[in-house]
């Protein structure tokens, strides 16, 4: 429940802070990037379809940054796993290079940690 409220709050913030005139959530176009066939993705799919104007899903391992061109917000769901550790070693981010990514993005689960590793962002925790 907390995740739903936080996500909805973020989406409202994105709308409120956009440089263009504000729009309702009915006009918001959201792209969920993750592992589509998981219970988590199915849960987000139901929630997003009820609350935003347009939602589409993209497989994280096949996603190209240009796939997000027609969307207002990207939700990246990138869990930790052995496969993720292999992605860390390859230096591949689903969002491409840090310097070229400019789309408003919500990082779900471990996506923040995973991006920090791949994009070599220094920081800490605690």
List each language-model region with its residue ranges.
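Sec-dependent signal peptide recognition
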Residues: 2-9
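Generic N-terminal amphipathic/basic segments
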Residues: 24, 60, 78-79, 105
């Amino acid at each position: 429940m907390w995740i739903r409220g936080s996500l909805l709050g973020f989406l409202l913030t994105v709308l409120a802070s956009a440089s263009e005139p504000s729009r309702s959530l009915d006009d918001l176009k959201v792209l969920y990037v993750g592992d589509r066939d998981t219970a988590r993705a199915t849960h987000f799919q139901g929630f997003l379809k009820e609350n935003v104007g347009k939602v589409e899903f993209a497989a994280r391992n096949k996603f190209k940054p240009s796939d997000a061109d027609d969307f207002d917000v990207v939700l990246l769901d990138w869990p930790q796993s052995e496969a993720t550790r292999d992605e860390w070693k390859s230096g591949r981010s689903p969002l491409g290079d840090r310097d070229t990514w400019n789309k408003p993005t919500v990082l779900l689960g471990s996506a923040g940690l995973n991006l920090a590793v791949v994009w070599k962002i220094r920081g800490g925790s605690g």
